[in-house]
A protein has these predicted regions:
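N-terminal assembly/transducer modules of large multi-domain enzymes
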Residues: 1-65, 239, 244-260
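Flexible, glycine-/charge-rich segments associated with ATP-binding catalytic modules
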Residues: 1-16, 166-168, 181-260
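Conserved short strand/loop->alpha-helix "switch" segment adjacent to the catalytic nucleotide/phosphoryl-transfer site
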Residues: 27, 93-117
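Conserved ATP-binding N-box helix of the HATPase_c
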Residues: 37-39, 106-141, 196-199
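Short beta-strand element(s) in the Bergerat
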Residues: 143-147, 241
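Acidic ATP/Mg2+-coordinating residue in the GHKL
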Residues: 151
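A short glycine-centered beta->alpha linker in the GHKL/HATPase_c
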Residues: 155-168
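Short adenine-binding "F-helix/F-box" segment of the Bergerat
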Residues: 161-162, 172-180
Length: 260
């Protein structure tokens, strides 16, 4: 949650001052970097003070110009999802290759790919997005991977509105929590299990962390402790949905079927 709130602070800075000052930044996690890259790409170049750190500055410049770099062994750069779900398999393969470089156990890899496929499917089936992006980072020394997806779709609360379930802005976090526990905007039997099983697999299987931000709500959940609910300020409303996970790659994971 802290990493997303860091992005919120920069968004408020831009709204209040009319520019972004990133000069002191040396490193950012995907939950900060992905939405920030999108914000930077939307504003004029002279409204951003770039980081003094050359590596981070170069990366932001690349993303702003929409010229995507080749994948490295430690991260997948800002990647735009295609309009059609059938064309999105390359995203899954990028993440598979990144995870395989950690000597991840086959069982863990299967569970990780399930999570990725479900998060991608959720974007296509529910969000009605115009643009969606992914960013991934692997931390070899820590043995963990961060994955972050964002879309500019109708948000989780608005998706529920379409079937008559209304959440006012103070309850957007509750809508997200309910989605993570099986409530679906699709009326067909058996729907709603995807995001629920993803949440359980991340927290209970990998003993990792998951953050979902949508509209005025944000929910963070980890293996230990109670979920954290936040209602966002007017200035930090997320016009779409952000899904971010952190998973340990080498920890033994229970069977996927324990979480379906």
């Amino acid at each position: 949650m802290r990493d997303y709130l860091k992005y919120c602070a920069y968004k408020i800075q831009y709204k209040q001052k009319g520019y972004l000052d990133l000069s002191r930044e040396k490193f950012m996690y995907p939950t900060t970097l992905l939405p920030l890259l999108i914000l930077v790409s939307e504003i004029t170049p002279n409204k951003t003070i770039m980081p003094e750190n050359r590596d981070l500055a170069n990366y932001i410049q690349v993303a702003r110009g929409q010229h995507l770099t080749d994948d490295t062994k430690t991260y997948i750069p800002l990647t735009k999802l295609p309009k059609q779900q059938r064309d999105a398999s390359f995203v899954v393969e990028k993440i598979r290759r990144l995870a395989e470089d950690t000597e991840i156990a086959v069982e863990n890899l299967n569970e990780l790919i399930y999570i990725v496929e479900e998060l991608i499917a959720n974007i296509y089936e529910h969000s009605e997005f115009k643009e969606a992006y992914m960013f991934a980072q692997r931390y070899k020394n820590r043995g963990v991977m961060d994955l972050c997806f964002v879309d500019d779709g109708i948000t989780i609360p608005r998706s529920f509105e379409k079937i008559g379930i209304i959440y006012n802005r103070d309850l957007h976090a509750e809508a997200i929590y309910n989605a993570l526990h099986g409530l679906s905007s699709k009326r067909e039997p058996g729907r709603g299990t995807g995001l629920k099983s993803v949440g359980r697999l991340v927290r209970e299987g990998f003993e990792g962390e998951i953050l979902i931000v949508s509209g005025f709500g944000a929910v963070y959940a980890a293996a230990k402790g109670e979920p954290l609910f936040i209602t966002l300020l007017e200035e930090t409303e997320f016009k779409g949905t952000l899904a971010s996970i952190r998973v340990p790659l080498k920890k033994a994971v229970k069977s996927l079927y324990d979480f379906l």
